């Protein structure tokens, strides 16, 4: 499974929301993510992809869409 599919599956499982048709929509504005959900998502992404997401790199505007989350995970895995 590729990173995109895995991230979409994690978001769907955590928040019971299929975001595959809203890849560039702000997930906070859409009600998918909130502050607690963000923490849950970070923990799940770190565990699943065996990465560490530095707090300095997880700003709301930096990871607020599915595409930005996928891009961030890809960059961290390639670092």
Curated annotation (Swiss-Prot):
The keyword NAD does not apply. It is found in: Cytoplasm. Pathway: Cell wall biogenesis; lipoteichoic acid biosynthesis. PROSITE patterns: CARRIER. The keyword Cell wall biogenesis/degradation applies. 4'-phosphopantetheine is transferred from CoA to a specific serine of apo-DCP. Keywords: Cell wall biogenesis/degradation, Cytoplasm, Phosphopantetheine, Phosphoprotein. NCBIfam families: dltC, PRK05087.1. This is D-alanyl carrier protein. It comes from Streptococcus mutans serotype c (strain ATCC 700610 / UA159). The lineage of its organism: Bacteria, Bacillati, Bacillota, Bacilli, Lactobacillales.
